[in-house]
Amino acid sequence: MLNFSDISYAERGMVATINSNRLKDKGVGQYQNAYNYKNQNFEDLRASCLKMGELFEDPFFPAEPQSIGFKELGPKSQEVHNVYWQRPKDIIHNPQFITNDFSPTDICQGILGDCWLLAAIGSLTTSPKLLFRVVPRSQSFKKNYAGIFHFQLWQFGHWLNVVVDDRLPTKNNKLVFVHASHRQEFWGALLEKAYAKLNGSYEALTGGSTMEGLEDFTGGMAQCIRLQNPPHNLLRLLRKALEKSSLMGCSIEVTNSDDVEKMAHNMLVKGHAYAITGLQDVYYRDKLETLIRIQNPWGRIEWNGAWSDKAKEWEEVMPEVQMQLLHKKEDGEFWMSYEDFMSNFTLLEICNLTPDALSSWDYKSCWHTTFFEGSWRRGSTAGGCRNYPETFWSNPQFRISLPETDDPEDSSDKSEMVCTCLVALMQKNWRHAREGPQLLTIGFVVFSVWYVQFQNLQDIHLKKDFFMKYRDHGFSEIFTNTREVNSHLRLPPGEYVIIPSTFEPHKDADFLLRVFTEKHSETWLLDEVNMLEQLQEETITDADLDQNSVELFETLANRDSQVDMYDLQKLLNKMSSKVKSFKSKGFSLDVCRRMVNLMDKDDSGKLGLHEFHILWKKIKKWMEIFKECDQDRSGNLNSYEMRLAIEKAGIRMNNRVTEVVVARYADANMIVDFDNFINCFLRLKAMFAFFLSMDTKKTGSICLNINQWLHITMWG
């Protein structure tokens, strides 16, 4: 019996994509119906362990060196020397999963450089509703304990249920990585382990932004604001973000690697991720002072300036305010003035939440959200940025309609009628490739277009001439080598096209494009519909027959005046060699078989004289299309030209089909000769013909049994 492992990687990818899309259509991947990561079902695994009287051991993230790291934390590293994996019950008496008095200061950083992740976790603890979406609180080390725990994490548009065992790396009976400020609590360490499993290893978590962690814990969209040049309404944005239960982080960026996690005289750490946990106005010296509360994920080392724990400013505020806000202990959490915040920090990150993460009373503050998964594939859909006009048009394209303006900040202000639109482009799975490829430089361009330009363009992939004509309409061109690139846009109502791309062409990657708007909007993929155009069939009369070709046909034909695919190959190669204006290496036997299939009307497997001449007429037309699309007159097509040539010949393909076609018929340099062009075109034409002949009710779908499927795919 054929196993899934017998299928090629490319075929597995196609099957996986189809199955994934089917599950997505059923709602799998939403928070309420998360995917089981690695197909591991928590309830089933726990029940099995309880029945067998065993503690769970995760085969997909084993208690072995490769789960810890591969380079700085690799098996030969001193950092992991004498590291042992232990379960909490073996580390301490009466371990607790989570206690009721959790706070941002519960979680402390270990030897791993993932302060960005801890800052995100710290922000998460300020909202129990969000925390318990990620950390199901019904778990414990007592009732139904089987050494297995699970967490809900968001990855690239989908929620995943990630299972881990509770074996944790320790040294001298102490946790090596994340640990609680009081040793009995283990939810933070196990959450870090689940996140490490999702990304391949603990070391894969080294270096990142708080924004990344916030998004993966909430499914929200993060904004990045440079505080050297802040928006004029930044304080209002901060207040609004806290009102919406948004999660926030801040940091002091460094330009010199030697300054990373270097402490300034005021005890702020450069290149270190902090969480913003509150905002408060207090009366100080007869005026209102805005304070901002910040938390250091280390659980220690606090700001020592104005409004710090021991600062004299607290002596001049009301005692009840002191009691409410001031906690004099070394817990990593501190207050500072808004002015000092702006003077010291350089980067602010805000994670805007999706509707499902908000309470019902927050409905008015919900964003309208849309997301698309896509890919860039070398030779087909990886066209690069606008610096490469010959291929830029081949990138995936998305149309957005913004018909409704935001509510004005002041009901009396009608001067600025705009639509707030957050656009974010994320590249997938880059942490999994830490030992190989790194982050690509990605970005997007937004084109403003008139509605009239889009009439009758619902299902058409815009071509090069469109972008050359409307080149000046493109804006918001941002390219960086980060996991995500985003932009906070305030646009007039209208129609727009978003083009996500890598900076350079021919770079393979998968991406997620998300659009958040304050008001109703419509966003969809702008792509071709797979379609075979009904072109007029060629006919031929006796007067059209060329005497030389007739004689050549008769010398190769059998006694019935017909040629099979072997004779057809000889015939076509002789005739094409006489076409001096056309360069060809000859026709392969596979192409000749497809031609016989296309033209054979009586199922004889052979062609008669008239059938052959109609075929030759078609071939000459295909030669003209090939030459027309061969812009550099090289005698071959590049893969982008092939797509245009196939369209001119009567077949429109969407991006997914184009990616498969290029992978199958282009060579290593993305070049397609005439034989492969014809082979591809005839295969597509045959598959369309099979499908349309069986889809008698024009439903767009057919049902086949295994015999029919094999017959069509093997003969097509």
UniProtKB/Swiss-Prot annotation:
InterPro entries: C2_III (IPR033883), Calpain_cysteine_protease (IPR022684), Calpain_domain_III (IPR022682), Calpain_III (IPR022683), Calpain_III_sf (IPR036213), EF-hand-dom_pair (IPR011992), EF_Hand_1_Ca_BS (IPR018247), EF_hand_dom (IPR002048). Ca(2+) 2 binds at D630, D632, S634, N636, E641. PANTHER family: CALPAIN (PTHR10183), CALPAIN-11 (PTHR10183:SF322). The active site is at C115, H272, N296. Its main location: cytoplasm. Keywords: Calcium, Cytoplasmic vesicle, Hydrolase, Metal-binding, Protease, Repeat, Thiol protease. This is Calpain 11. GO terms for biological process: proteolysis. Calcium-regulated non-lysosomal thiol-protease which catalyzes limited proteolysis of substrates involved in cytoskeletal remodeling and signal transduction. Signal peptide: none annotated. Ca(2+) 1 binds at D600, D602, S604, K606, E611. Residues 55-354 form the Calpain catalytic domain. Its EC number is 3.4.22.-.
